Amino acid sequence: MKKLLTLAAMGMFCISGMAQEQPKEEGFVFTTVKENPITSIKNQNRAGTCWCYSTLSFLEAELLRMGKGEYDFSEMFIVHNTYLDRADKAVRTHGDISFSQGGSFYDVIYGMEKFGLVPEEEMRPGVMYGDTLSNHNELTAVSDAVVAAIAKGRLSKLQADANNVPLWKKAIASIHDIYLGERPE
C-alpha cells in the first residue's frame, strides 16, 4: 500500500511539472495619442463644498488649456467669503434664504468677482485643525446655530460696535477664521 501511495504521489508530481500555463489573453491595450496637461486632484473630504472644488478645478483646467499656466486656487478663500455673504442674506431675510453647506457654480464666479482669488498656499483646507483635508462638520454645526439664532430670533434691534458693524457678523467671521483660517488681504 505504501508503494502504491508513493507511486501515485510521484506520478502526480511529475504530471504537475509537465503542465503548461494557459496563455493569458491580454485585454485591450490603450495607446496614448495625445496627453493633455491636467491640474492636481483635489479632495473635499468632509465638507459640502463640491460646488467650489469643481468650479475652481474647471477654471484651473481652462487656464491650463488656454496656455495661461498652472494655478491652484484656494477653495477655502471662496468658501469663507461666500458663507459670510450668505449669513448676511439669511439674517436680512429672517432665515428665508438657506444658510447651509452647498452652493452652485455661480457662487464661485460671484466670489471671484467680488473678492478675487488667492493661491492655495495662502489658505489651505484643514490647516486650522492640523489636517490637510477639509472637515466642516463642526463648523457647520456652530455657524448654522449662530445664524439661525439671529435670523429667527425675536430681537427688535441687533447690537453693533462703534463703527455700526453688527456684532453677530463679527462672531460669524471669527468662527470662520477659527475653522478655515483668516482671509489674506
Feature-to-residue mapping (PLM):
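Catalytic-core signature of thiol
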Residues: E21-E185
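Bacterial Sec-dependent N-terminal signal peptides
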Residues: M1-Q22
